Amino acid sequence: ASPINSHFTPYANYMPGYEDDVIMAAGTFIQGASIELSADGPIRPPYVAYVQGGLTYSHVKIAICSAIDALIEKELLTIS
């Protein structure tokens, strides 16, 4: 849901310090900083994403809830 480069498809790649290829994601410049919200995750089961930071609790909570809603709508995630 980030306005910056949200139309691009992310591709996993090697990054020093990681055992697996990773996708790095950062939705930036909403409140003026490049560290507002970022996440990364290894490309292997169980496909976990690690939220690296956020400037405000509300911003991070909205982003995580939006991501979960999108996964549920696309039937990529079920919550029982």
Curated annotation (Swiss-Prot):
To B.cereus similar ORF in glnR 5'region. Coiled coil: none annotated. It holds the Pfam family Met_gamma_lyase. InterPro entries: Met_g_lyase_put. It comes from the Bacteria. This is Uncharacterized protein in glnR 5'region.
